[in-house]
Amino acid sequence: DATGTIDTVVPTYISEIVEEVAFVARSNPKIDKRSGVSQRLPITCLENVVSNAERRALASGETTAVPRVTDLYAALPSITGKFELEYEGELRGADNVAREVIRTAVGQVFDGWFTNVDTRPVIEWFDLGGTLQLGDATPSEELLEQTGQIQGLLELAEHARVKRTDPAPLV
């Protein structure tokens, strides 16, 4: 808007994934248990996730910033700065370990939200050659336009408490 302020809406599943990142990191054998995982990890991770969403909203001229799962990768420095690695983790590198932690956390939260939900139409769409060309800076309207062509995706989104009638940044 004219004042440059942006409303921020953090979807529940994003908050859950950020919390799960901390739990997964604490149980990851590549992360040093003696040093532990900082209790600030989820706080700084969420701050970075929200910051990336706000950056995208400002660049796109949107008035609402809504973090996406991909925004978790913008938080890599804040994640890697909150734990120390075991020898095996050192060999893989902090970024790779953090990416593994994010992937695991996303998968676990996804499984929790979509247990007993038929995801086959979405999988089939991709199996039949469906592709998306989306970047970190893709505006919400364009993201919605591209993902709207995936059969069954909006029905799945409703399980994540997303309504088809929500403004583009929220869908």
Regions found by a protein language model. Give the residues of each.
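Conserved AAA+ ATPase small/helical "lid" subdomain
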Residues: A2-A57, E62-V66
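C-terminal engagement/docking regions of AAA+ P-loop ATPases
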Residues: R34, E54-V171
